[in-house]
Amino acid sequence: MAQYDQLEDKDSLDIHDNPPAPENVVKEDDNTVYFVYDEEVEEEEAPPPPTPEPIVQVNDKPHKFKDHYCKKPKFCDVCARMIVLNNKFALRCKNCKTNIHHSCQSYVQFQRCFGKIPPGFRRAYSSPLYDQEINNPGQQNRTDPVFDTLRVGVIMANKERKKGSEDKKNMMMMMMEEEEAQQPKEDEEGAEGKQDGDKKDKTATDDKNKKQQQTFSQSHYYMALYRFKAIEKDDLDFHPGDRITVLDDSNEEWWRGKIGEKTGYLPMTYIIRVRAGERVYKVTRSFVGNREMGQITLKKDQIVVKKGEEVNGYLKVSTGRKLGFFPADLLHEL
């Protein structure tokens, strides 16, 4: 085996005996070797671009904050944390009523104040949702689309409500004048007793319509369920148990009613219709009912309408939204 290995070693060629010359080597006749390298080109560094001038943010409508004592727990419109300190002092905007901590004042210095907000649509315009306006100065002068939509909707609703009530009132006045003009004519024709067949049919139809109108007007009335304090000048102020005459029910939410000599608008959910023969009761003490037994829970001074006879000391009553049994000894008839 050793002989075969020696023969193989003689025939083999080692790369280290005659290594290949690299490409960048130049060899002359006197065995002088030169290495050739590419010339390095130094790249000139471009001067850095000039730094842009910082955008100076100007707030044309800043908040007007003043020290405010919070009698009730309030939440900061910036950090959404409760304003609870020993003295409960906070900063409150004079116009938009925004409440913030003293430490959060720097976060709203570039926010615009939206001014006074109509009652019923007060929103936190200085909440963190509006912090994006600080990063985008081009959109600082944009108004809130939700607020504009609500404001236009309220204005249009008030116009339609007043316009509909005026049209309804004019139509009722015209109908009353026509009925008054037709009534003496019918009396004279009835006294003479000389009417044709067509006139008799017409008179009978008119009398029937009048009887139906009288029956409809006397078939029900409306009773106040809750206390409603007038918000606007044309609203009707009433207390629970007041009897209300409805003049206009064309609107789905606000009706026009009358109590004595006072007229105005009222929310239709605050009243209940009472039909002829139904009795109205007032709750004298709060009671928690059992739903499994068909009982309802009512609070003191609530107004209910009787809907059934007494069974085992319980009356079936209705509040307009709920219907069930209630102890008869806790009800006082109005």
Swiss-Prot record:
GO terms for cellular component: cytoplasmic side of plasma membrane; cytosol; T-tubule; voltage-gated calcium channel complex. The keyword Cell membrane applies. Signal peptide: none annotated. It is found in: Cytoplasm; Cell membrane, Sarcolemma; Cell membrane, Sarcolemma, T-tubule. Residues 217-276, 277-334 form the SH3 domain. A zinc finger (Phorbol-ester/DAG-type) spans 62-113. Its main location: cytoplasm. It is a peripheral membrane protein. InterPro entries: C1-like_sf (IPR046349), PE/DAG-bd (IPR002219), SH3-like_dom_sf (IPR036028), SH3_domain (IPR001452), STAC1/2/3 (IPR039688). Component of a calcium channel complex with CACNA1S. This is SH3 and cysteine-rich domain-containing protein 3.
